[in-house]
Amino acid sequence: MSTYPPETLDPDYDDGTMPSNVDTLAEAVVGQRIVTVEKDVRIHDRYYGTRNATVITLDNGKRVSLVNTDDCCAYTELEAFLLHPERVDHIITGVGTTDGFTRWHIYADMGDVLELTVGWSSGNPFYYGYGFNITVEEVSA
């Protein structure tokens, strides 16, 4: 089973936003299977009308959307993802990170199911917002 020890960053560099983002994603995906992953999907946004997101569709009929953020010099951006189709039949058991929250791992008993490459900066700590906007919604029929 893959596990990743929790990362800890200097409090001058991150105010807990990144670990909170990982926890939010884990709450949405653990115990489920990934059906699809799509990048640059237009989704409804309560503030901006629509925005692009990376959308993970799960076997429980829910869609988890990760929306990039940018606020002046602070940002969080999904740069790339790698889905391991040979492992999508396995139930997700956790979400971990490596390399200072720049590599995110959604994993199951047989290893990573989905790997995310994430660029991020807290900018001028902590005046500007950063971290993914993560939403979970039911897939409409």
Label each PLM-derived region with a short phrase.
Residues 2-141:
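Surface-exposed, interaction-prone regions used to assemble/regulate multi-protein complexes
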